[in-house]
């Protein structure tokens, strides 16, 4: 349960994960009073300039610390000691609240500060964490209680003007940032046809869509992105290339297939709008898209990630997976295979809501990188992109 895990972690981790003689870094003032995030440096996507913060920190990291930056790991329900030990041993660089907390903003801030105290020289080379949550609104709002607004569903948000949504999103973002959450796994940019919305299990049935056409979805998704950015919170456009045309939910079902979406589909325009608005993260779905790549899930498809997302839509930020740790869509693959295949196909940041699965993926990636120079270069490029994103959100030790 998130509440118990968060409070336990806040109360017990003041000395955990530290090497002898080291001191836990004090939480940055930006946790409570952030300024706007900087635009991601162009070096993030073409091999960073030698003088950049990211490359300086990268050069000081061990290979294990670098690989640890590739992970966004769910921590709900995990004992505080296990989380701290995993960060110390496997150097995981980003952590994800999951489940529903009613502890309130003050308690969540305390937990987030305790998490950031784990960013020691030995654990993460003093690179602080993206602390993420799914704070979309409606049925998908993980942080609740005193200090948090009741965020309406995206379908309700879509009825606001874009300007009003941006204003309200900035307020929700300030709440997240005050709680120490600096990455929102939102907005949902999937376009769900109105005629099939109730049969669309992952999005429409939960009213997670802003509307039923690319224009409405794009405009309101961009407003959400801009509002959160004003508050200093990074955002994630999901679930590329869209879950609006499927029936099953990849969290709970395998073999989810989209037979409609192709490289020129109009529904991609909502994601294109988010990319033009400089969204820093795009999450890739765990469905199969027969008109794009009939042989691979999108998160394992170079056609989807390298061809469509990078080359056609010119996305230059961090590509993050949907849950590779516990989703039913990937249950038939070993964790080691999941992580390696995602990175090899063009992904950057691995989401795993399972700590054991994350550990298995981490170790497999380290082994493959040690044995394969080309894969090691792929890993290093992904790490640089993640570090550049962290630099933009003031999480690097260069400030």
Where are the predicted features?
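C-terminal region of N-terminal signal peptides and the immediate post-cleavage residues
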Residues: 12-42, 46, 399
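Bacterial N-terminal signal peptides
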Residues: 4-14, 134
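Mid-to-C-terminal alpha-helical segments outside catalytic/metal-binding sites
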Residues: 370-398
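Hydrophobic faces of well-ordered beta-strands that scaffold small-molecule active sites
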Residues: 68-75, 93-97, 129-135, 183-187, ...
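Second-shell loop/turn segments in exported
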Residues: 40-45, 73, 77, 97-103, ...
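Second-shell residues forming the walls of enzyme active-site clefts
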Residues: 62, 82, 106-116, 215-370, ...
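DNA-contacting surface of Y-family translesion DNA polymerases
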Residues: 41-110, 141
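Glycine-rich, aromatic-flanked loop segments that form ligand/cofactor-binding clefts
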Residues: 116-149, 168-195, 217-241
């Amino acid at each position: 349960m998130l509440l118990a895990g968060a409070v336990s972690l806040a109360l017990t981790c003041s000395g955990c994960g530290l090497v002898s003689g080291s001191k836990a870094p004090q939480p940055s003032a930006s946790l409570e009073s952030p300024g706007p995030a900087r635009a991601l440096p162009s070096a993030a996507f073409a091999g960073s300039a030698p003088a950049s913060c990211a490359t300086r920190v990268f050069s000081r990291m061990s290979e294990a610390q670098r690989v640890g930056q590739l992970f966004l790991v769910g921590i709900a329900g995990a004992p505080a000691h296990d989380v701290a030990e995993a960060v110390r041993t496997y150097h995981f660089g980003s952590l994800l609240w999951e489940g529903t907390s009613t502890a309130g903003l003050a308690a969540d801030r305390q937990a987030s500060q305790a998490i950031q105290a784990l960013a020691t020289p030995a654990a993460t080379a003093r690179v602080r964490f993206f602390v993420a949550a799914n704070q979309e609104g409606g049925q998908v709002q993980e942080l609740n209680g005193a200090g948090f607004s009741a965020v309406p569903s995206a379908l309700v948000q879509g009825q606001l003007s874009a300007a009003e949504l941006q204003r309200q999103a900035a307020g929700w973002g300030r709440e997240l940032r005050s709680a120490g959450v600096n990455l929102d796994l939102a907005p949902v940019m999937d376009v769900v046809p109105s005629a099939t919305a109730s049969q669309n299990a992952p999005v429409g049935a939960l009213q997670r869509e802003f509307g039923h056409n690319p224009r409405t979805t794009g405009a309101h998704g961009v407003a959400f992105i801009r509002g959160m950015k004003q508050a200093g919170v990074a955002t994630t456009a999901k679930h590329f290339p869209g879950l609006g045309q499927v029936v099953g939910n990849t969290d709970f079902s395998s073999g989810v297939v989209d037979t409609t979406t192709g490289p020129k589909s109009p529904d991609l325009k909502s994601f294109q709008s988010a990319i033009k608005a400089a969204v820093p993260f795009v999450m890739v779905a765990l469905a199969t898209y027969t008109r794009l790549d009939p042989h691979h899930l999108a998160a394992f498809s170079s056609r989807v990630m390298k061809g469509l997302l990078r080359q056609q839509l010119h996305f230059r930020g961090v590509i993050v997976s949907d849950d590779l740790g516990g989703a039913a869509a990937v249950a038939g693959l070993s964790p080691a295979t999941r992580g390696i295949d995602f990175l090899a196909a063009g992904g950057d940041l691995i989401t795993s809501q399972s700590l054991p699965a994350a550990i298995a993926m981490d170790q497999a990636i380290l082994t493959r990188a040690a044995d394969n120079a080309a894969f090691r270069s792929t890993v290093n490029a992904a790490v640089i992109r993640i570090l550049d994103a962290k630099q933009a959100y003031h999480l690097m030790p260069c400030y």
